[in-house]
Design a protein with these regions (language model features):
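Bacterial N-terminal signal peptides that target proteins for export
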Residues: 1-9
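Hydrophobic helical h-region of N-terminal Sec-dependent signal peptides
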Residues: 9-17
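C-terminal motif of bacterial Sec signal peptides marking the signal peptidase cleavage site
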Residues: 19-22
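Beta-strand/loop edge motif enriched in small/polar residues
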Residues: 24-248
């Protein structure tokens, strides 16, 4: 447990240090990096940047994806193994609901949502209704995820056979009540979920089937649906977690 606390502290300290850097660059178009090889404007193969990326917030290593501006998703985004997606403070990611296949953020690599108290990261939907989109679904090889000062809302849609979560064998189409808003399953992976607000999600707010993590200072509200109340923190075997100061 002490090792996990050290990991969490180092990640959050690193995030704070990054915020002191000042550079410039435009945001990467998310559609350059979508779904199994990508069909972006330049035929990007969904492996992140070939060069160091600098923004007004920080400098990111090669192989990164960086969202520094508000982003609207009309299809799922898949972050490949070995690639890291960084979402900067104050960014709002809006998932469209009127789509044939529910939008999902499937993290096979790493995800760092680096919000602050003043500028949280928001992941929401366009119509603000539960089950408008799927959720943040991490794969079996996802190594690290940080959700710090993140507002996650209106997730919980049921996947189809065309969904990225189904294609990667993470969830079935017969799941009861839709996918959770955040799912982590790598027993050797690490995650931090801190200072975040999960609300109005159709199924469980979070669901863990593996991993070493810290869950601290989060708020969970309006979980589940009329048939199934949903759980704030649903933990199964294969997890080693420190959980403290959460409210629901």
């Amino acid at each position: 447990m002490k090792k996990i606390n050290t990991f969490a502290a180092l990640l959050l300290m690193a995030a704070a240090a990054m915020f002191s850097t000042s550079c410039e660059n435009d945001n990467i178009n998310p559609y350059d990096y979508v779904n199994n090889g990508g069909n972006g404007s330049e035929g990007n193969e969904n492996q992140g940047s070939k060069d160091v990326i600098t923004t007004k917030v920080a400098e990111y290593p090669k192989g990164s994806l960086v969202w520094s501006k508000d982003t609207t998703l009309s299809e799922s985004v898949e972050i490949p193994v070995g690639t890291s997606l960084y979402i900067e403070p104050g960014v709002t990611v809006t998932c469209r609901s009127e789509v044939q296949v529910p939008v999902e953020i499937v993290v096979l690599g790493n995800l760092y949502c680096l919000g602050t108290a003043e500028k949280p990261v928001t992941i929401t939907s366009d119509t603000k209704k539960p089950a408008d989109w799927g959720g943040i679904i991490c794969g079996y090889n996802s190594e690290e995820v940080v959700l710090n000062h993140v507002d996650v809302a209106y997730a919980g849609a049921t996947p189809t056979e065309s969904s990225a979560s189904f294609q990667n064998k993470l969830f079935k189409t017969t799941i009861d009540g839709g996918v959770p808003a955040f799912h982590f399953c790598n027993v050797n992976g690490k995650f931090v979920m801190a200072n975040s607000f999960f609300h109005d999600n159709y199924n469980d707010q979070t669901y863990f089937t593996g991993g070493n993590g810290l869950i601290i200072n989060n708020i969970f509200a309006d979980s589940g649906n009329a048939a199934d109340g949903g759980e704030a923190i649903n933990v199964k075997a294969g997890c080693k977690l420190d959980v403290a100061n959460n409210r629901s």
